[in-house]
């Protein structure tokens, strides 16, 4: 019985990986994981499904999750990211671990999205148990080194701080309703919408000036002097000092040239509390690297420790890279006696060669033609 037309398709936003694509993804992933290991990060794996009670989204994020029910009626969620599941795991399975703890991962995540695929591969790290700006700088530097390691593209890292945004909003005294709308448009880089929103609220000119300039504040360290002209609020001074220190440490790591300070960055997940960053590559209209500090998350799991980390959208990066061929077999073995073909193929594989054996008798000419179509350069015919 033939499958229906629906049975021949895959759900919207999901994808198959053909050999060339998978080979490229696996090489990039292995390269990133080897780098993470060299920086003392240990790989972990969490379940594809988590209880909804673990993920606990804020209202605006909930619609982006894939949800289902188990047989007991509990809400289950396909993991939309790895930071929260790892926080659950560390707080339960690894309680009492010596901090700081460095963990890394490679996994598929699932989110409804208008801008890109709904299933995508991520590699990333979590640095748990340190509030130092050096920890923030380490994860930014590691993200940069990972992008360099994957190779083949230009990229730009934008670095900001959530405390600067909240400090400025507090200084200006804008209504909470306005702040939520402004924050939403700022996260989407909707500059036209921001200008319209600010004008509609009719703030005094000084407040309007700050609100319209903030989204465009990006550059090098001296840009932070502008922020201090707007406010000397203690929380804002602390955030600016922390961001300065992270930026200076990045020079020590030798990666500062890849980084631009950007005070318009607001991460999409609600748990970010300090330094935040995004990475962009040409041809992709959304960040391929997202990360930052989230010091409040572990407290929700009963383990009150600071943390920072990042995730790289490997799928988005690979789509921008030219697919190289998957590793083709090196030797094609054929012959009239299947037992001898099997024996010869085994012998060659034991030497480390990639071997394809012919399953049917072929003439020499047929074998050459078949190997040529497959891109196999060496042919062994056994009698």
Swiss-Prot record:
Tagged with keyword Amino-acid biosynthesis: yes
The signal peptide stretch is none
- Coiled coil ranges: none
PROSITE patterns from the UniProt entry: AA_TRNA_LIGASE_II
Recorded GO molecular functions are:
catalytic activity, acting on a protein; histidine-tRNA ligase activity; transferase activity
Which keywords are on file for this protein?
Amino-acid biosynthesis, Cytoplasm, Histidine biosynthesis
Gene3D superfamilies, sorted: Bira Bifunctional Protein, Domain 2
Listed under GO biological process in this entry are: histidyl-tRNA aminoacylation; L-histidine biosynthetic process
Pathway(s) where this gene product acts: Amino-acid biosynthesis; L-histidine biosynthesis; L-histidine from 5-phospho-alpha-D-ribose 1-diphosphate: step 1/9
Got a GO cellular component term for this one? cytoplasm
| Annotated compartments | Cytoplasm
Q: Is-annotated flag, keyword Cytoplasm?
A: yes
| Subunit (UniProt) | Heteromultimer composed of HisG and HisZ subunits.
NCBIfam families, A to Z = hisZ_biosyn_reg
HAMAP family found in the cross-reference section: HisZ
Per the similarity annotation, which family is this?
A: Belongs to the class-II aminoacyl-tRNA synthetase family. HisZ subfamily.
Additional remarks: This function is generally fulfilled by the C-terminal part of HisG, which is missing in some bacteria such as this one.
Q: What does this protein do?
A: Required for the first step of histidine biosynthesis. May allow the feedback regulation of ATP phosphoribosyltransferase activity by histidine.
This chain belongs to which protein, by name? Answer: ATP phosphoribosyltransferase regulatory subunit
What organism does the record attribute this protein to?
Answer: Desulfitobacterium hafniense (strain DSM 10664 / DCB-2)
């Amino acid at each position: 019985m033939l499958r229906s037309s629906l049975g021949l398709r895959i759900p919207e936003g999901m994808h198959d990986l053909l050999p060339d694509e998978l080979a490229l993804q696996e090489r990039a992933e292995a390269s990133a994981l080897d780098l993470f290991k060299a920086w003392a990060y240990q790989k972990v794996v969490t379940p594809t499904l988590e209880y909804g009670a673990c993920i606990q989204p804020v209202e605006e994020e909930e619609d982006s999750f894939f949800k289902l029910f188990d047989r007991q009626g509990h809400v289950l969620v396909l993991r939309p990211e790895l930071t929260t599941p790892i926080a659950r795991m560390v707080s339960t399975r690894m309680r009492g671990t010596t901090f700081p703890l460095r963990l890394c991962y490679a996994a598929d995540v699932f989110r409804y999205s208008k801008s890109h695929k709904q299933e995508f591969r991520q590699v990333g790290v979590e640095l748990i148990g340190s509030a130092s700006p050096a920890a923030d700088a380490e994860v930014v530097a590691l993200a940069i080194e990972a992008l360099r390691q994957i190779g083949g593209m230009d990229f730009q890292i934008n670095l900001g701080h959530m405390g600067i945004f909240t400090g400025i909003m507090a200084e200006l005294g804008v209504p909470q309703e306005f702040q939520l709308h402004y924050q939403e448009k700022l996260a989407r880089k909707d500059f036209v919408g921001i200008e319209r929103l600010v004008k509609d609220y009719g703030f005094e000119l000084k407040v309007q000036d700050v609100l319209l300039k903030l989204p465009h504040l990006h550059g090098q360290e001296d840009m932070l002097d502008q922020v201090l002209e707007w406010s000397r609020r203690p929380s804002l001074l602390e955030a600016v000092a922390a961001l300065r220190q992270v930026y200076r440490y990045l020079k020590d790591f030798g990666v500062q040239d890849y980084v631009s300070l950007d005070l318009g960055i607001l991460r999409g997940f609600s748990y970010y509390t300090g330094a935040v960053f995004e990475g962009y590559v040409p041809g992709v209209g959304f960040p391929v690297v997202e990360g930052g500090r989230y010091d409040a998350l572990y407290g929700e799991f009963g383990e009150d420790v600071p943390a920072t980390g990042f995730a790289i959208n490997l799928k988005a990066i690979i789509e921008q890279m030219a697919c190289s061929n998957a590793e083709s077999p090196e030797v094609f073995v054929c012959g009239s006696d299947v037992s001898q073909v099997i024996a010869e193929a085994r012998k060659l594989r034991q030497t480390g060669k990639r071997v394809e054996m012919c399953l049917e008798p072929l003439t020499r000419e047929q074998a050459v033609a078949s190997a040529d179509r497959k891109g196999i350069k060496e042919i062994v015919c056994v009698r």
